[in-house]
Amino acid sequence: MKMVKSIAAGLTAAAAIGAAAAGVTSIMAGGPVVYQMQPVVFGAPLPLDPASAPDVPTAAQLTSLLNSLADPNVSFANKGSLVEGGIGGTEARIADHKLKKAAEHGDLPLSFSVTNIQPAAAGSATADVSVSGPKLSSPVTQNVTFVNQGGWMLSRASAMELLQAAGN
């Protein structure tokens, strides 16, 4: 009788394990479980990338450029990369003459202050440039345009205006 109870208990346990296994396989037989994400918020705007900063030079960059242009120890023939379109031979000779004349008359060195730098047309910027020197009673301020052509340089029109102003 003891043996019959053991066999009955073993069969019951086997039946329970078999039933459990059959239930598990029937759940898995339906294929893999796929979860779907449900949207929670409708109509909410997505965050945008921050606006890119305008392409403008720093005051230090422009001041350095202007100091290089006003250096009487360097010929204008070597300053072509500082002016849009370069500096032609005749222009270089005229500018060198005027700069040497200014040095002889004690008008140099010049000091530049660059303020109010603003983006302009694509690849350009404007700035208020104040020039002071030994013989200027007060700084002279002019709005000047700079262009970015692989590096910041003085626009051709502004270079001609400055050259004409220096001749007066």
From Swiss-Prot:
Query: Where does it live in the cell?
Result: Secreted
The UniProt keyword set, sorted, is: Secreted, Signal
Q: Give a yes or no for keyword Signal in this entry.
A: yes
Q: Residues of the signal sequence?
A: 1-22
Query: Where do the TM regions start and end?
Result: none
Q: Any keyword Cell membrane?
A: no
Name the propeptide positions. 23-48
Cellular component GO terms held in the UniProt record? extracellular region; peptidoglycan-based cell wall
Q: What does this protein do?
A: May play a role in the development of protective immune responses.
> What family name appears in the similarity comment?
Belongs to the MTB12 family.
Tell me the protein's name. Low molecular weight antigen MTB12
Q: Which organism is it from?
A: Mycobacterium tuberculosis (strain ATCC 25618 / H37Rv)
Q: Provide the organism lineage as a comma list.
A: Bacteria, Bacillati, Actinomycetota, Actinomycetes, Mycobacteriales
Q: Which gene encodes it?
A: mtb12
